[in-house]
């Protein structure tokens, strides 16, 4: 996945440059500590669910520290995974009870209008609300996400694509 996605390629290129810096030329202790913390935490993550949680936490922390006014204006907040799962499952139940359809059914389009880092869609794929045999059709045709914050938009793309790739494990890359 990371070799095919253009955003992932760009981010990895930047990270490679950071890795090559030696400690003498990199004297910002706060950034070094943050980077080392991220590196330590990410080394043990092997699932897309774990990556999603780390991405969300880092994104919110980064924005709240680097751009507090933007965070406040745009309402950038991390929604805990448990709340995301509750909302996704509740929506599916309401659709079944009130409209006799499920989120996985054909012609039921799913729109996340303020997707942030793509957690709602990633979790929708991970929690099997959409069964594996229906995921490819839904992914290619009926999942939609919008975001006005460019960094979040790129992260959402990576998050959703990597989640899909982990579930389907195809030999070829599928862009979201």
Model segments located where?
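SAM-dependent methyltransferase catalytic region
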Residues: 41-42, 46, 50-51, 57, ...
